[in-house]
């Protein structure tokens, strides 16, 4: 029986996502023996500083990529929003699975919406993108960094450390925690991170056997949308250091891409959106990035450099 080893982070959410990928692979190839290889990454271990301060989201990938290079794993499963815009050779995105809910969720044990939070309420999130949008809609809020796994973050909310926190809807759904969502923060008013809600599988470019297996998981509409989002982010030189949001969706006759660049300090948001054919995501991403730059995003990006 052929064997396929999936490198994954040890967190409950990462394991759930990897188990889902494994189940899909077993459905596609019933004779395939799929096993998970759980690993700890530096991004999971260093929790007292922001991702921007310790090197960015790529810290969630490094150990998993090394496992593939050593021959200890055949592929790795990630939340696509955590995958850097450019994968260094010899790695590739072999599959992007059908997207789950791309929205963020406001979670509070007392207040029912962002608008109902009292003046000066304490809201926690580690994402600069979320902080910038919170600052735009509610400049009075007190914002705090919050890292750790989903249950750790929820525990801090439940202990009274904060009045509300913001997490990704998709992660909560995959953990069976939909009931904790107080309000969805969703497009078009609120934009997610590029690729948010999608699961990606990374493999070695040279491994044609694994690439062929994983290609059966790929969802073309999702891939086309996230290509547009990630191309926009790449053209802006975006990273976890920069508050960038993007969301592409299918509409009548084409694809629509909405993008934003924000500033946490003063809550400024620069927005742009364009439409194109569904197979022109790369061109659409570059065009929206240029619109953002022309509208003043260059100033905000320079301030974060």
Swiss-Prot record:
SUPFAM superfamilies: Periplasmic binding protein-like II (SSF53850), Porphobilinogen deaminase (hydroxymethylbilane synthase), C-terminal domain (SSF54782). The porphobilinogen subunits are added to the dipyrromethane group. One of its GO terms (cellular component) is cytoplasm. Belongs to the HMBS family. Its cofactor is dipyrromethane. Tetrapolymerization of the monopyrrole PBG into the hydroxymethylbilane pre-uroporphyrinogen in several discrete steps. It catalyses: 4 porphobilinogen + H2O = hydroxymethylbilane + 4 NH4(+). One of its GO terms (biological process) is protoporphyrinogen IX biosynthetic process. Pathway: Porphyrin-containing compound metabolism; protoporphyrin-IX biosynthesis; coproporphyrinogen-III from 5-aminolevulinate: step 2/4. It is an enzyme of class 2 (transferase). InterPro entries: HemC (IPR000860), Porphobilin_deaminase_cofac_BS (IPR022419), Porphobilin_deaminase_N (IPR022417), Porphobilinogen_deaminase_C (IPR022418), Porphobilinogen_deaminase_C_sf (IPR036803). It comes from the Bacteria. GO terms for molecular function: hydroxymethylbilane synthase activity. This is Porphobilinogen deaminase. Monomer. PANTHER family: PORPHOBILINOGEN DEAMINASE. Keywords: Porphyrin biosynthesis, Transferase. It comes from Xylella fastidiosa (strain M12). Pfam families: Porphobil_deam, Porphobil_deamC. HAMAP family: Porphobil_deam (MF_00260). Binds 1 dipyrromethane group covalently. Its EC number is 2.5.1.61. The modification S-(dipyrrolylmethanemethyl)cysteine is found at residue 240.
């Amino acid at each position: 029986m052929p064997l396929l080893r999936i490198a994954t982070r040890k967190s409950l959410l990462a394991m759930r996502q990897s188990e889902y990928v494994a189940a899909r692979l077993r459905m596609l190839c019933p004779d395939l023996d799929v096993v998970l290889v759980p690993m700890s990454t530096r991004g999971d271990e260093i929790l007292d500083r922001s991702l921007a301060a310790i090197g960015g989201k790529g810290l969630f990938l490094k150990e998993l990529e090394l496992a593939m290079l050593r021959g200890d794993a055949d592929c790795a499963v990630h939340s696509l929003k955590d995958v850097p815009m450019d994968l260094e050779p010899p790695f590739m995105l072999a599959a992007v699975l059908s997207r789950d809910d791309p929205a963020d969720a406001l979670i509070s044990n007392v207040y029912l919406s962002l608008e109902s939070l009292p003046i000066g309420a304490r809201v926690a999130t580690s994402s600069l993108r979320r902080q910038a949008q919170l600052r735009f809609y509610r400049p009075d809020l007190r914002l705090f960094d919050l890292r750790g796994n989903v249950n750790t973050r929820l525990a801090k909310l439940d202990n009274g450390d904060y009045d509300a926190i913001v997490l990704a809807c998709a992660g909560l759904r995959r953990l069976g925690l939909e009931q904790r969502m107080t309000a969805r923060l969703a497009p078009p008013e609120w934009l997610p991170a590029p690729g948010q809600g999608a699961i990606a599988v990374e493999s070695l470019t040279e491994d044609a056997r694994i690439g062929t297996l994983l290609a059966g998981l790929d969802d073309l509409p999702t891939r086309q949308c996230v290509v547009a989002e990630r191309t926009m982010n790449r053209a802006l030189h975006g990273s976890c250091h920069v508050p960038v949001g993007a969301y592409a969706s299918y509409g009548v006759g084409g694809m629509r891409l909405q993008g934003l660049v924000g500033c946490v300090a003063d809550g400024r948001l620069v927005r742009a959106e364009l439409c194109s054919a569904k197979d022109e995501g790369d061109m659409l991403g570059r065009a929206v990035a240029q619109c953002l730059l022309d509208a003043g995003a260059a100033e905000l990006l320079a301030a974060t450099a």
